[in-house]
Design a protein with these regions (language model features):
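Catalytic nucleophile loop
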Residues: 93-100, 326, 334
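Aromatic-acidic/polar surface patches that form glycan- and anion
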Residues: 94, 233, 371-375
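Short connector loops at helix/strand junctions that flank enzyme active sites
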Residues: 95-97, 114, 191, 305-307, ...
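Core catalytic alpha/beta fold that binds nucleotide/phospho-ligands
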Residues: 252-329, 333-446
Length: 446
């Protein structure tokens, strides 16, 4: 399997390394394309990554390998990528490419070869989750193309330009067949930090879905949300390059001592052990928004439950945070046996269930009740700790809605499903509506 290194210049010096980052030469960034994509998709990163050498993997059936059948295999890709492992390197895969990069990293581990410094996953469902678009692989051409244009950012010209359709359709069919046939095989999590990049306007793989990548590492996880849609790597490469080069120069996801600077439209969430020593971010007691003015005018909220802590940081304004595990509450279990809610039920200020929420619990399938209750209670606690007015007495109208949930007085609640060494958990962050870009650092050490 051939690999086509991109010819790059080095007009800027290497980024200043963090004291905890690996010493030595600047790393290579090995990039795997999205379905239907090719090495050329990464030309935008070439001039934006400074001293980081961008190496784009060319899959068969595209660009300079157009004459080859468009099928590939992970073992053959790993054979060629292995030649780059003698120097520091990182893997980046976008959409389908992220799933390929994940499997390449696992195959390198099986072979006892040096692991990447990072696994970067862009706009991709976690490998243990189904890809909804995979169902389009068997559709007739017109319907297949329509789905890709509407949902995956494929060019409109695919509908109307016969030459482009003739060129790309065999590659797209082959790639989506690979996605459809892919089966995740459980193995221990990677000892490689994982950084997931989501597109703010990507309805196919929203940022919350990408938090599931935390299940697949025990070396730290981060999520960053970029402006753009599903193919932000094509249209927003400068921002992506800035985040990657800064990360490679730093200590790794979740290893810093301060939250990253947040912008006006951004909220940063950090998840860490509740017994983290004093003096580190989020180590103060309490759960109020504290509106503590930090550097740059940012405010912070902290909450603890079940051995976990969550810290939310915004720039300006107020913010509230809450975290919990499903086993922490008993109303869902009571509902299974026909109990009534009673007055003032709830384990903390502001998190009692409303009558409408209780009715939803009673009507829900028994296995869904703990999570639905957790969503209602954490949402209410986050709002209360932000200083927002409590939700209307009836409660939230749809506990199964993905969020953000609109709340009273112009507030909203965003949920983060968490995958931590203590098990599955849920964080809720309350903020004024309009602050939409999520970034997160999640503790995953086992």
């Amino acid at each position: 399997m051939a690999i086509e290194p991109l010819s790059i210049t080095r007009p800027t010096p290497p980024p200043t390394p963090h004291p905890d980052s690996p010493a030595g030469p600047a790393p290579a960034l090995l990039c795997l394309p999205y379905a239907g994509g090719a090495a050329g998709a990464y030309h935008g990163l070439r001039g934006a990554c400074g001293a980081v050498e961008v190496v784009a993997v060319q899959l068969p059936g595209r660009e300079n390998r157009i004459a080859e059948p468009p099928e590939f295999s992970v073992p053959r890709l790993t054979d060629e990528i292995a030649s780059h492992t003698a120097r520091p390197y990182a893997l980046y895969g976008h959409s389908m490419g992220a799933r390929i990069a994940f499997e390449v990293a696992r195959e390198l581990r099986r072979r006892g070869l040096p692991p990447p410094l990072r696994l970067y996953a862009g706009a991709a469902h976690p490998p243990d989750r189904r890809v909804p678009l995979a169902a389009t692989a068997d559709l007739p051409d017109e319907a297949f193309i329509d789905q890709l244009v509407r949902r995956a950012g494929a060019p409109e010209e695919l509908r109307d330009v016969p030459e482009l359709r003739e060129l790309l359709l065999p590659v797209l069919r082959a790639d989506f067949t690979w996605i459809k046939r892919y089966r995740y095989a459980p193995e221990p999590p990677l000892d490689v930090p994982v950084v997931a990049f989501a597109g703010l306007g990507d309805a196919e793989v929203p940022p919350g879905d990408m938090l599931g990548w935390a299940r697949h590492t025990r070396a730290g996880f981060a999520l960053r949300t970029l402006r753009g849609g599903h193919l932000f790597v094509r249209d927003g490469s400068a921002e992506l390059a800035r985040l990657i080069t800064a990360d490679l120069a730093g200590p790794g996801p979740g290893r810093g001592t301060d939250p990253p600077p947040v912008q006006d439209d951004e909220i940063h969430v950090r998840v860490f052990p509740a017994d983290e020593p004093p003096g580190t971010p989020g180590s103060d007691e309490g759960g109020s928004s504290r509106a503590a003015d930090r550097a740059g005018g940012s405010s912070q909220a902290v909450d603890r439950a079940g051995g976990l802590a969550v810290e939310a940081t915004v720039r300006g304004g107020a913010v509230g945070a809450a975290v919990g595990l499903p086993a922490a509450y008993g109303a869902a279990r009571d509902a299974a046996h026909g109990a009534s809610p009673g007055a003032g039920r709830g384990d903390g200020p502001g998190d009692g269930l409303g009558p409408g929420e209780w009715e939803q619990l009673v009507d829900a399938a028994e296995e869904d009740r703990p999570w639905l209750e957790l969503r209602a209670r954490t949402a209410r606690r986050a709002l209360a700790r932000a200083g927002a007015h409590a939700q209307a007495a009836e409660g939230f109208p749809d506990l199964a809605a993905p969020g953000p949930w609109p709340a009273d007085d112009g507030w909203q609640v965003t949920f983060l499903p968490l995958h931590t060494p203590l098990g599955e958990a849920l964080a809720a962050v309350a903020e004024p509506r309009g602050r939409t870009r999520l970034s997160a650092d999640v503790w995953t050490d086992r």
